[in-house]
Every structure is written in C-alpha cells, then in structure tokens.
Amino acid sequence: MQVILLDKIGNLGSLGDQVNVKSGYARNFLIPQGKVVMATKANVEMFETRRAELEAKVAEQRAASEARAEKLSALDAVVIASKAGDEGKLFGSIGTRDIADAITAAGEAVVKSEVRLPEGALRNIGEYEVSIQLNSDVFAKVNLTIVAAE
C-alpha cells in the first residue's frame, strides 16, 4: 500500500516520502495515529499544498522535544528505592513505568513509552544512565540511582 509520510518514522523515511508498507500496518497503526495518508492523487496534491505548513509543525515539535531534553538532562540523579537482598539484587525489577513515574515525580513529565531500556528491566542496586526518546531523533540521558529500601 502506497502512503505519504506526515512525520519522520524510523525505518520508513521522513516527512513527504512516498513509501510502500503492508496494508495492515497502515490501516491499523499508521493511519489512526495520523502519521500517514494514503497516496491517492487528491492526497498527493493536498500534501504538496500543505508541505510548508507540515514542515513547520515538525520543526516546532522537534524544538519542543529538544527543550524537554535540556530540562531532563539538567535533572539531578533520580532516586528509586526498592526492596533488595543482601547482595544488591532487587526483589522484582525496575521497569519503564517505575522510571517514568520517578522522573515525573522529580519534576519533568515523562510517559513510559518514552523510556528506553535496551538491556531490559533493571534488577540490581546501582547507578544507571537511562535514555529517554522524546522524538524520533531527540534523545535525553537521565542518571538513575536505585537504592535499597529500608
């Protein structure tokens, strides 16, 4: 299915690209989220007339994401207290939801879908550098400290 991208999407392309995607991916995910439109003649003409407006919107979103990244990078170490055993191994784990809640409590709103944990959930006491993906190409690093709860 031919679609026109209205936003930068990883592994597909950037604003204005016409790409071929599977019809289920387009119908069930991309179109409902407003990231693409079908590549009909009318939509191609509409896109060309609104191209500057859409590019300005994308630039504005990127600037807002970069401002949030600056605020997140300026945060002091975020501390999470969790029950742990004698050797520093946690009972349970710290996942994306826990990290997002802790950063939000520290003063900057973050949703769990923005938190990136490439090695999976955190299971030990210690200091970690967590990546927050605010936009398709804007990342922020946050220092996270996990301590044993008393």
UniProtKB/Swiss-Prot annotation:
One of its GO terms (biological process) is translation. One of its GO terms (molecular function) is rRNA binding. GO terms for cellular component: ribonucleoprotein complex; ribosome. Coiled coil: none annotated. Pfam families: Ribosomal_L9_C, Ribosomal_L9_N. It comes from the Bacteria. Keywords: Ribonucleoprotein, Ribosomal protein, RNA-binding, rRNA-binding. The keyword Protein transport does not apply. PANTHER family: 50S RIBOSOMAL PROTEIN L9 (PTHR21368). Binds to the 23S rRNA. Belongs to the bacterial ribosomal protein bL9 family. This is Large ribosomal subunit protein bL9. It comes from Photobacterium profundum (strain SS9).
